[in-house]
C-alpha cells in the first residue's frame, strides 16, 4: 500500500530503573480471543534486556476500527493506519517500542511500507491489512531492518495466550503492563472483549502517547465498531490527562474476529448491543485509568467531577483546566487541600462561571458553597482525604445541566526525573 501523506525497566535511554507506580494494578486473569494470536520478541530497537516488538495475527475476515491522535504532526504509523482503515479488514498488528517513527520524513513512510510488506509476506495477506504502531523517542529514524529481522521469531512465537507478553513489549516509561477483560452476551450469544494499553507520559486529550488495542470475538460490521469505539473513547481515553501534552503517536483500535457467530447487528442503537456497549465502555475506562495510575512520577489518582455547567462540553473543558493546572496538581502531591487553586482553574478556563454560585468539594466535603466558604467548615476530613491515594474533587457551577468527569494524577519531582533523562 502506498501511503498518502510489574517489574523494573531499564533502557539505554534511562540511566536508572523506574520503580513500579504505587498506584499499579496487577494483570487480571486474561483469556483468549478466538481468532487472535500474539507474540513478543526483542528486536533491539532501543532497550536492552527486554522485548520491544509485539505481533498480533487475526483470522481472515477480522474487522477493524480505530481512532487516532489529533496532533498536527502525527507519526508515519498513524498515517499508515488511517489509510489502512479505509478498508474494513485486518490480518495483523505490529507494534514497536523505543522509537516513535515521528518527524522522520520519507524515511518514516518507507519504514512503514517495509515493515508492512515483510509482515504481509510472512502471514500471506495484503500489506493494507497490516496495522502498524510505534512509540518512543521522536525524530530518530526507525531501524526497520531490526524489526524485519525479528519478524520470523515473532511469527514462530504466536500463541493465543500471548496477551500479557504483548502488553509488556509495548511499554516505554510505563512501570506496569496494562490489560482488561470482559465477558458478555449479544442476543444470548457469549462474546469476549479483551484489551491491552500502554501510556505513562505525554498523556492528554485528544488521547496521548497512548496505545490501546482491544479484540473481541463478536461479529460486528465496521460502522458499528467505529461508532462504539468513538463513543467509548470520549468517555475514557479522551477524559484523562497526565501532563496536558497530546502525543503524535496515540491510537485506540478494536478488532472483531466474528468467531462468536452472534446474530447480526448492523445498528449501533440496537438493544441487543446494550450489554456489549456497557462492557466495552467499562473496559476502555479501566484501561484509561491504568494509564493515569502509571502517570510519570504519579502517587495519586485524581477524579474531577464538574456539574451545573452551561453544557457538557463546557463542563469537560473546565474539568480539564482543573486537571491540567500545575498548581492544583502540585498541591495534591503535597497533600495540601488548597481549594483556592481549584477556583482559580475554573475562572481561567474561559467557560461560563459565576463566582457567587460556585461550590467546591474535596473528598465529599463541601468547602465552598455559593461563592463563599461553608460556615463552620472543618478541614480535618479534607486533610485526611488528601493523604489517600485516590483524590476526589467536585465542582458545581449552578448554571445548567452540563456535567463531565475527568481523571488526572498529581505532579511530583518524579515527573522531572523521568523526562529530564528520557534520552540521556
UniProtKB/Swiss-Prot annotation:
Q: Which UniProt keywords apply?
A: Acyltransferase, Amino-acid biosynthesis, Arginine biosynthesis, Autocatalytic cleavage, Cytoplasm, Multifunctional enzyme, Transferase
Query: What Pfam families does the entry give?
Result: ArgJ
Localization terms from the record: Cytoplasm
Q: Which reaction does it catalyse?
A: N(2)-acetyl-L-ornithine + L-glutamate = N-acetyl-L-glutamate + L-ornithine; L-glutamate + acetyl-CoA = N-acetyl-L-glutamate + CoA + H(+)
Q: Which GO terms describe its cellular component?
A: cytoplasm
**Gene Ontology biological process terms from the UniProt entry:** L-arginine biosynthetic process; ornithine biosynthetic process
Catalytic residues identified in the record: 209
Span-the-membrane segments of this chain are none
Q: Where does substrate bind?
A: 172, 198, 209, 296, 419, 424
The residues annotated as site (Cleavage) are 208-209
Q: Does the keyword Cytoplasm apply?
A: yes
Task: Report the pathway entry.
Answer: Amino-acid biosynthesis; L-arginine biosynthesis; L-ornithine and N-acetyl-L-glutamate from L-glutamate and N(2)-acetyl-L-ornithine (cyclic): step 1/1; Amino-acid biosynthesis; L-arginine biosynthesis; N(2)-acetyl-L-ornithine from L-glutamate: step 1/4
Site: Involved in the stabilization of negative charge on the oxyanion by the formation of the oxyanion hole. Where? 135-136
Q: Which Enzyme Commission numbers does its entry carry?
A: 2.3.1.35, 2.3.1.1
Record bears the keyword Thylakoid: no
Q: What is its main location?
A: cytoplasm
Molecular-function annotations in GO: glutamate N-acetyltransferase activity; L-glutamate N-acetyltransferase activity
Which protein family is it in?
A: Belongs to the ArgJ family.
Q: What does this protein do?
A: Catalyzes two activities which are involved in the cyclic version of arginine biosynthesis: the synthesis of N-acetylglutamate from glutamate and acetyl-CoA as the acetyl donor, and of ornithine by transacetylation between N(2)-acetylornithine and glutamate.
Q: What is said about its interaction partners and assembly?
A: Heterotetramer of two alpha and two beta chains.
What is the recorded name of this protein? Arginine biosynthesis bifunctional protein ArgJ
Source species: Gluconobacter oxydans (strain 621H)
Amino acid at each position: 500500500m502506498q501511503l498518502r501523506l510489574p517489574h523494573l525497566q531499564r533502557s539505554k535511554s534511562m540511566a536508572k530503573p523506574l520503580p513500579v507506580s504505587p498506584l499499579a494494578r496487577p494483570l487480571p486473569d486474561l483469556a483468549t480471543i478466538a481468532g487472535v494470536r500474539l507474540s513478543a520478541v526483542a528486536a533491539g530497537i532501543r532497550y536492552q534486556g527486554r522485548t520491544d516488538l509485539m505481533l498480533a495475527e487475526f483470522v481472515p475476515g477480522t474487522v477493524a476500527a480505530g481512532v487516532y491522535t489529533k496532533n498536527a504532526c502525527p507519526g508515519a504509523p498513524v498515517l499508515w493506519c488511517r489509510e489502512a482503515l479505509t478498508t474494513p479488514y485486518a490480518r495483523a498488528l505490529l507494534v514497536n517500542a523505543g522509537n516513535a517513527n515521528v518527524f522522520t520524513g520519507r524515511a518514516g513512510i518507507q519504514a512503514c511500507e517495509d515493515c508492512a510488506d515483510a509482515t504481509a509476506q510472512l502471514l500471506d495477506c495484503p500489506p493494507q491489512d497490516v496495522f502498524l504502531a510505534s512509540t518512543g523517542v521522536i525524530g530518530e529514524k526507525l531501524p526497520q531492518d531490526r524489526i524485519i529481522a525479528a519478524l520470523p521469531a515473532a511469527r514462530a512465537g504466536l500463541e493465543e495466550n500471548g496477551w500479557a507478553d504483548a502488553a509488556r513489549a509495548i511499554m516505554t516509561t510505563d512501570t506496569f503492563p496494562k490489560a482488561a477483560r470482559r465477558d458478555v452476551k449479544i442476543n444470548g450469544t457469549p462474546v469476549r472483549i479483551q484489551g491491552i494499553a500502554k501510556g505513562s507520559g505525554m498523556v492528554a486529550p485528544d488521547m496521548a502517547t497512548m496505545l490501546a488495542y482491544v479484540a473481541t470475538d463478536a461479529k460486528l460490521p465496521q460502522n458499528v465498531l467505529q461508532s462504539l469505539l468513538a463513543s467509548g473513547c470520549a468517555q475514557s481515553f479522551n477524559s484523562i490527562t497526565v501532563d496536558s501534552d497530546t502525543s503524535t503517536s496515540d491510537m485506540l483500535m478494536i478488532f472483531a474476529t466474528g468467531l462468536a457467530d452472534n446474530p447480526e447487528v448492523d445498528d449501533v442503537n440496537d438493544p441487543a448491543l446494550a450489554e456489549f456497549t456497557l462492557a466495552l465502555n467499562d473496559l476502555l475506562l479501566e484501561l484509561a485509568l491504568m494509564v493515569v495510575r502509571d502517570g510519570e512520577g504519579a502517587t495519586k489518582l485524581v477524579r474531577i467531577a464538574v456539574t451545573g455547567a452551561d453544557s457538557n462540553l463546557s463542563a469537560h473543558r473546565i474539568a480539564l483546566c482543573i486537571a491540567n493546572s500545575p498548581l492544583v496538581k502540585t498541591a495534591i502531591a503535597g497533600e495540601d487541600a488548597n481549594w483556592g487553586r481549584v477556583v482559580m482553574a475554573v475562572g481561567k478556563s474561559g467557560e461560563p462561571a459565576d463566582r457567587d454560585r460556585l461550590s467546591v468539594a474535596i473528598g465529599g466535603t463541601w468547602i465552598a458553597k455559593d461563592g463563599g466558604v461553608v460556615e463552620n467548615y472543618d478541614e480535618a476530613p479534607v486533610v485526611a482525604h488528601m493523604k489517600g491515594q485516590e483524590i476526589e474533587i467536585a465542582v458545581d457551577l449552578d448554571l445548567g445541566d452540563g456535567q463531565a468527569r475527568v481523571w488526572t494524577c498529581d505532579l511530583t519531582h518524579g515527573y522531572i526525573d523521568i523526562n529530564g533523562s528520557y534520552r540521556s
